[in-house]
Regions:
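Conserved N-terminal subdomain of the carbohydrate kinase-like
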Residues: 1-65
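Conserved beta-alpha-beta core of the PfkB/ribokinase-like small-molecule kinase fold
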Residues: 65-120
Length: 120
């Protein structure tokens, strides 16, 4: 269903990987009294690894900007940030949901967009 929608809207799906017996990652957001709570179910996003990145590298290295967030495994994010840095590809890191990140590779991101929770 999602793939059909993307294709109908002329979005390139060449590098989308279907993971058998795994659901699509989802996030459920609730809002009460101006404060939000988010429940993330990683699903297939938890399966994104170096192999997925390597298979899509020819497209990634041509990008003007690569956006990553903490909804895929942290080692994969680190791998993406390092490879992009080496290839002079700008990286926007959205550190959501909040997690402990290694400052050594965090400095390699071009832009970081934390909210008030991730910043603390």
């Amino acid at each position: 269903m999602i793939m059909d929608n993307l294709k109908e809207n002329h979005i390139n799906t060449e590098y989308i990987v279907t993971v058998p017996d795994t659901t699509t990652g989802t996030a459920h957001i609730t809002l009460a009294e101006g404060d939000n709570s988010i429940i993330v179910i990683a699903g297939a996003n938890a399966k994104v690894d170096k192999n997925v990145v390597d298979n899509a590298w020819s497209a990634i290295e041509q990008a003007d900007l690569v956006m990553v967030q903490n909804e895929i495994p942290i080692p994969t994010i680190e791998y993406i940030v390092r490879r992009c840095h080496e290839a002079n590809v700008k990286v926007l890191l959205n550190p959501a949901p909040a997690a402990d990140l290694n400052p050594e590779w965090l400095e390699l991101a071009t832009y970081i967009t934390p909210n008030e929770h991730e910043l603390s």
